[in-house]
Amino acid sequence: MSITREKKSELISEYCLKKGDTGSSFVQCAILSERIRNLTEHLKTHKKDFHCRRGLMVLVYRRRNGLQYIKKKYGDDQYLALIKRLGIRDIFH
């Protein structure tokens, strides 16, 4: 269910803004998106896992707030590029 250290370092290197960037909002949204994908796959087989479902909703809320921050701070162009790279829908348009 959780992402491995190797996968996390791949995401950090792919979405970082500069070398050594591990905590920017772009990286955080990418890591949250991967965790959301993992939990979604888990819930496909374990439909009654309501504790996991609540955790998924918390992660979705955190990612939405991060995306909202990116859109406000960096503009529509970088926001749209990020959601295209992540493969998620635009929820603000």
Swiss-Prot record:
Single GO BP term: translation
One of the Pfam families matching this protein, by short name: Ribosomal_S15
Gene Ontology MF terms: rRNA binding; structural constituent of ribosome
GO cellular component: cytosolic small ribosomal subunit
Highest taxon of source: Bacteria
Classification via SUPFAM superfamilies: S15/NS1 RNA-binding domain (SSF47060)
Entries under CDD domains matching the protein: Ribosomal_S15p_S13e (cd00353)
InterPro entries membership: Ribosomal_uS15 (IPR000589), Ribosomal_uS15_bac-type (IPR005290), uS15_NS1_RNA-bd_sf (IPR009068)
Keywords: Ribonucleoprotein, Ribosomal protein, RNA-binding, rRNA-binding
Subunit structure, interactors included: Part of the 30S ribosomal subunit. Forms a bridge to the 50S subunit in the 70S ribosome, contacting the 23S rRNA.
Function noted in UniProt: One of the primary rRNA binding proteins, it binds directly to 16S rRNA where it helps nucleate assembly of the platform of the 30S subunit by binding and bridging several RNA helices of the 16S rRNA.
Family, similarity comment: Belongs to the universal ribosomal protein uS15 family.
Protein name according to UniProt: Small ribosomal subunit protein uS15
